[in-house]
C-alpha cells in the first residue's frame, strides 16, 4: 500500500474498515447512534408466521415498535453468484422508485418478489416526509446473478446510514435526475462511496421524461462523467443508462407481466440491469479464511433464542459450529443453531452473504451491534493500536483546520463507532509531531474507550461532526 508518497494522497481514502485483501466489509456504525431502523428480511425468517419480534433496547429513547413477520419459505438454492449492490444519490432523484421498478421488472421475468415503493420506504417517519432514513435490503435475480440490493437514503441528515449500506456494496447504481443534474448530495455520495471502498458504479439518469431537449441530457451525462473522474472513478468508461423509474413503475403496476420489448421505459430498467451484470464484476469472496461476521442488528425470538444479522466478511459458517462473540464486552462462546438468508434456510453461509444467525444460550442483552462473531481464537478485542492514517483535505470533505495529540474523534470499525483518543503522532519521516494538517499522512497511536475486535491490516474511518475526516489502516496492535 502506497502510504509514503505524497502523490498517493487520494488513494488512501479507500481505507475504512476490514483487512487489506477485502475492499468491502460490514457497516461502520453502532445502533446507539441511530434508532430509526426498519426490519430487514435477514432475521425475519426464523419466526413462526405470527411471531412478534422485539428489538434490543438502545441507549436512545425512541418509542418501541413491534413487528409481525413471516416464517421461512423453503430452502435457499445457491444456483447463481451472489452480488451486493445498492442505490445512492441525491434526495428525491428517484432511488427508491428505481429500486421498486427493478424488483417489479425482474419479478415479471420470474426472478424476484415484487416490492412496491411503500414496502421499501416502510418506516412511518420516512414515508411522512417522502425521504428514506434507513437502508432497506431487497433481493432479486437476473439471468446470471442473485442480487441483494440496499436502498440508501439520500438526505443529508442521514449520511451516516448511507455509509451503513454502502460499506456492504460490491457496486452501486448512482441515480441522478436528468432534469436537475448532479446536486450536492450526488457529490457527497460519490465521495462516501470512494471512502468506504465501493469499487464500481453504474449511472441511471432518471426523469428522462421531464427533459425536453436531448442536448440537456447529454450535458448532464458529461457533467456526471467529469464528477466521477474527479473522484478517481473511471468516468469515461462508466455505463450510463437514461430512463424514467416512475413511468416504468407505473407501467409495471398496471401490468405486472410486462416483458422485454413491451414498454420503452421498462426496457430501460432491463438495460440498466444488463449493464450492472456486465460492468460490476463478481467479487472474489474470502471463503478460505476463518469465519468472521460483524453484528449489525440483534433480535430476540421467544422460544427460539437470539438472532444476530450481518454480512459474512470472510470464511463460512454452518449450523452446529461454535463461534466467539468478541468486542465491547468480555469474549464468550456460543453455538450457531440456525442460518438463514432472505427468509430461506441455508446449509452454509459464505463470505459476502447477508445472513441471520440463531445463537444458542445468548440473551439479547448479551450481544449488540459492533461485536463480531468469529471462529474461536481467531480474533481478540483490543483498545490500543498504531495506525497509518490519511487525513482528508477540505476539498475531499474533511476538516478545514489541523488537529493535535489528544484529539478525540469517533473511530468507525466494521459496524461499530467508538470514541478514541489520539495519544501520539509521528510524521512520514518517523519524527514525533504534535499537529496534523488536512492532507497529511501520519502514523498515530490510538486508545479506544472500549475494547473492539480488531487486527493488523484492518481499515477504519475517522469521523467528527457528521463527516469523515480521515481513513486509516491498523499497523500493529499494542494492547
UniProtKB/Swiss-Prot annotation:
Extract the transit peptide range from the record: 1-71
Q: Which sites bind GTP? A: 89-96, 151-155, 206-209
Q: Which GO terms describe its biological process?
A: mitochondrial translational elongation
Q: Where is the composition biased (Polar residues)?
A: 33-43
Question: Where are the stretches annotated G3?
Answer: 151-154
The tr-type G domain is annotated at 80-284
One term of GO molecular function = GTP binding
| G2: region residues | 130-134
Q: Give the location in the cell.
A: Plastid, Chloroplast
What is this protein identified as? Elongation factor Tu, chloroplastic
Protein's organism: Glycine max (Soybean)
High-level lineage: Eukaryota, Viridiplantae, Streptophyta, Embryophyta, Tracheophyta
Amino acid at each position: 500500500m502506497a502510504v509514503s508518497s505524497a502523490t498517493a494522497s487520494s488513494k488512501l481514502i479507500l481505507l475504512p474498515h476490514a483487512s487489506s485483501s477485502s475492499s468491502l466489509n460490514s457497516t461502520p456504525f453502532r445502533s446507539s447512534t441511530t434508532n430509526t431502523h426498519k426490519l430487514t428480511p435477514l432475521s425475519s425468517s426464523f419466526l413462526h408466521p405470527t411471531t412478534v419480534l422485539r428489538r434490543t433496547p438502545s441507549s436512545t429513547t425512541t418509542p418501541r415498535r413491534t413487528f409481525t413477520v413471516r416464517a421461512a419459505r423453503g430452502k435457499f438454492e445457491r444456483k447463481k453468484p451472489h452480488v451486493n449492490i445498492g442505490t445512492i444519490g441525491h434526495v428525491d432523484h428517484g432511488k427508491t422508485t428505481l429500486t421498486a421498478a427493478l424488483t417489479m421488472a425482474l419479478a415479471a421475468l420470474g426472478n424476484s418478489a415484487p416490492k412496491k415503493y411503500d414496502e421499501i420506504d416502510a418506516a412511518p417517519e420516512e414515508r411522512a416526509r417522502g425521504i428514506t432514513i434507513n437502508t432497506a435490503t431487497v433481493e432479486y435475480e437476473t439471468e446470471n446473478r442473485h442480487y441483494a440490493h440496499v436502498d440508501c437514503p439520500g438526505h443529508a441528515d442521514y449520511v451516516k446510514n448511507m455509509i451503513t449500506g454502502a460499506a456492504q456494496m460490491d457496486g452501486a447504481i448512482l441515480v441522478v435526475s436528468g432534469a436537475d443534474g448532479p446536486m450536492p448530495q450526488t457529490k457527497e455520495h460519490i465521495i462516501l462511496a470512494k471512502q468506504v471502498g465501493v469499487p464500481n458504479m453504474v449511472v441511471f439518469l432518471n426523469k428522462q421524461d421531464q427533459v425536453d431537449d436531448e442536448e440537456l441530457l447529454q450535458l448532464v451525462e458529461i457533467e456526471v462523467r467529469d464528477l466521477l473522474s474527479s473522484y478517481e472513478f473511471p468516468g469515461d468508461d462508466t455505463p450510463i443508462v437514461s430512463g424514467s423509474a416512475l413511468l416504468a413503475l407505473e407501467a409495471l403496476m398496471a401490468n405486472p407481466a410486462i416483458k422485454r420489448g413491451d414498454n420503452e421505459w421498462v426496457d430501460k430498467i432491463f438495460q440498466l440491469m444488463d449493464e450492472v451484470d456486465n460492468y460490476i464484476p463478481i467479487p472474489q469472496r474470502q471463503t478460505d479464511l476463518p469465519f468472521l461476521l460483524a453484528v449489525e442488528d440483534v433480535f430476540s425470538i421467544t422460544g427460539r433464542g437470539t438472532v444476530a444479522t450481518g454480512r459474512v466478511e470472510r470464511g463460512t459458517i454452518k449450523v452446529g459450529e461454535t463461534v466467539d462473540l468478541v468486542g465491547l464486552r468480555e469474549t464468550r462462546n456460543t453455538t450457531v443453531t440456525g442460518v438463514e438468508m432472505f427468509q430461506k434456510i441455508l446449509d452454509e453461509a459464505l463470505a459476502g452473504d447477508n445472513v441471520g444467525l440463531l445463537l444458542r444460550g445468548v440473551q439479547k442483552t448479551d450481544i449488540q451491534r459492533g461485536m463480531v462473531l468469529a471462529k474461536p481464537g481467531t480474533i481478540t478485542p483490543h483498545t490500543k493500536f498504531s495506525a497509518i492514517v490519511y487525513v482528508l483535505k477540505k476539498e475531499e470533505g474533511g476538516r478545514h483546520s489541523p488537529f493535535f495529540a489528544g484529539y478525540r474523534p469517533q473511530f468507525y470499525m466494521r459496524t461499530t463507532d467508538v470514541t478514541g483518543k489520539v495519544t501520539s503522532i509521528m510524521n512520514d519521516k518517523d519524527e514525533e509531531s504534535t499537529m496534523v494538517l488536512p492532507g497529511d499522512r501520519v502514523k498515530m497511536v490510538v486508545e479506544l474507550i472500549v475494547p473492539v475486535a480488531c487486527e493488523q491490516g484492518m481499515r477504519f474511518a475517522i469521523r467528527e461532526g457528521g463527516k469523515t475526516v480521515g481513513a486509516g489502516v491498523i499497523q500493529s496492535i499494542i494492547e
